[in-house]
Amino acid sequence: MGKKIMLQGTASNVGKSVLVAGLCRIFKQDGYTVAPFKSQNMALNSFITKEGLEMGRAQVFQAEAAKIEPIADMNPVLLKPSGNNKSQVIVRGKVVGEMPSSKYHDYKLELVDVLKETFNSLNSRYDIVVMEGAGSNAEINLKDRDISNMGMAEIADAPVIIVGDIDRGGVFASLAGTMLLLNEDEKRRVKGVIINKFRGKKELLQDGVKMLEDIIKVPVIGVVPYTDIKIEDEDSVTTRFKKKMNKSDIHIEIIRTPHMSNFTDFNIFETQEDVSIRYVDYGESLGNPDILIIPGTKSTIDDLTYIRKSGLESQIKNLHSQGKLIFGICGGYQMLGKKLKDPYHVESEIEEVDGIGLLDTETTFEKEKTTTQVEATIVECISEYMNNLKGKKVKGYEIHMGITKRGNDVRSLDLITKKLDKEVNYTEGSVNKEGNVIGTYLHGIFDEISFTRAILNNIRKKKGLGELESKVNSFNEFKDKEYDKLADFLREHLDIEKIYEIMK
């Protein structure tokens, strides 16, 4: 069996996911085979593997850092919040059902064997498994059924490093308080702590570090400065949503709905120098974007209701009348249609609701979930926004419960040619007659830079600007370089030799 180490946190969003990714890349650089593992993840950001199984995106980018193919066993339990204190429960990549938190709390004990099996499988195949906890590891009211933090560390017999976020303040109290709430067996597992997201001069922190070590009786393995290395965030508690538009040639606005999922679909735009992004929150009005995107969502009907109540629907239609480009991904695609039907109450108690009506489509929610990777070719080129798009190859993945039928006033966007490595031939997506409203089920479609850059250059041409080439030729290559930057950065600020000593 291989070695293992587990990073746990004093709270959510302390930076565990990025640190795990960095360690995965460091160990890979040092000649080891390495895999990430997170027993339970709660997130709306998910991914579909080559086997058609669903998993959290955090373990996907960690697997990328380790230079291995992501598999669902790296995240055996995924919870996707669906509102009203309920979550869709996904085990080993497949939907088990929707459960209220009280029912899931009891169900967790049935998952212990699954966690043992999936972890042991990875641990037997890789030299090192880097494990990640979830949220705070000292939730004393949930400890008897913990499968995410110390409970999982016990299953795996893994040493633990605790991560605290100094940027939010109170890091010494949070680390010391966390240690105080652990029982003696759990304390013995903790071999060190990391102070993350530090801003300022480290010299000013040294006395505090020494005092903390005296209190908690374990070493501070590193003080990691805040960094803007472009690595995916695990959940929506992220600074990217707080960004406002900077001066740039092309402005993109994305409606941040309450159940927005897969915001990683839009990370590619941050690599394009002529693009600025603004996420539109509740109570905010749309501006004058060149592209408006309605993203994917875990609860399409609820988020459509949100768009109506917030007054955004009329603003969306106004942008359409101005000829602006409107793009819907997955749930956003469904909303842009004329009707959404839910005969089996998959989404809500409402059986039928009018859509925004900018696409001549009708969506019916089905009981079975579509989860697949696909490859496609763009087939439509019917407006100035779509010049030079015909024939472009794109890849993506689908995660949805609905089936969308096109009417006579729309055309298909793309031809699916491969599905889960099998050759197929069917059309997908919709484009209105004017060519300025586009819908697709393909998450990740913008990651194909030739496709995305063609759209951006069409907008530049429409605005009387010259074309630009992307400085990033491949999004995967760009991410790979960022993982190397992250590894170099962590080598500088963490005691990597100490981490090797800790692993067992």
Curated annotation (Swiss-Prot):
From which domain of life does this come?
A: Bacteria
Q: Which Gene3D superfamilies match?
A: 3.40.50.880, P-loop containing nucleotide triphosphate hydrolases
Active-site residues annotated for this sequence: C330 (nucleophile), H443
Q: Hey, which pathway is this one from? A: Cofactor biosynthesis; adenosylcobalamin biosynthesis
A GO biological-process term: cobalamin biosynthetic process
> Which PROSITE patterns does the record associate with it?
GATASE_COBBQ
The protein's matches in CDD domains, at most eight in alphabetical order, are given as: CobQ_N, GATase1_CobQ
Q: Which UniProt keywords apply?
A: Cobalamin biosynthesis, Glutamine amidotransferase
One Pfam entry name: CbiA
Tell me the ranges covered by the GATase cobBQ-type domain, including all copies: 249-451
Q: Name one GO molecular function term.
A: catalytic activity
Task: Name the job this protein performs.
Answer: Catalyzes amidations at positions B, D, E, and G on adenosylcobyrinic A,C-diamide. NH(2) groups are provided by glutamine, and one molecule of ATP is hydrogenolyzed for each amidation.
Give the UniProt family note. Answer: Belongs to the CobB/CobQ family. CobQ subfamily.
Q: Which PANTHER family match?
A: COBYRIC ACID SYNTHASE, DETHIOBIOTIN SYNTHETASE
Name it: Cobyric acid synthase
Which species is this UniProt entry from?
Answer: Clostridioides difficile (strain 630) (Peptoclostridium difficile)
